[in-house]
């Protein structure tokens, strides 16, 4: 099964404040093309399975340096160094508000 090019991201925590706030929802686009300044979803190198949202601040050879916009509240490349390209899963593109959950009514019931 093919992967969709977009995936939802729920922001949790304050490491990206004031740019992103906890509770916001964003769509991220899977892409190998990222650049300095992009806000990306990163597979956290210190904790397998943990995804974080950080800003790319510089390129370090073939790897990327990622940091939170709120340095006092962010665990990022300042702690664990640059991340591999494969650790960057996508780039945040657009903020959205999820619709409230509703049941689909049955017909003729």
Which residues fall in each region the model found?
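Extended hydrophobic leader/signal-anchor segments used for secretion and membrane insertion
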Residues: 1-109
């Amino acid at each position: 099964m093919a992967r969709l090019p977009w995936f939802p991201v729920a922001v949790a925590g304050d490491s990206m404040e004031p740019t992103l706030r906890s509770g916001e929802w964003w769509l991220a686009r899977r892409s190998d093309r990222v650049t300095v300044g992009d806000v990306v979803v990163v597979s956290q190198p210190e904790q397998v399975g943990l995804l974080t949202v950080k800003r790319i601040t510089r390129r370090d050879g073939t790897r990327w340096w990622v940091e939170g916009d709120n340095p006092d509240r962010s665990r990022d490349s300042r702690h664990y160094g640059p991340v591999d390209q494969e650790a960057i899963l996508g780039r945040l593109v657009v903020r959205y508000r999820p619709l409230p959950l509703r049941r689909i009514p049955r017909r003729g019931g």
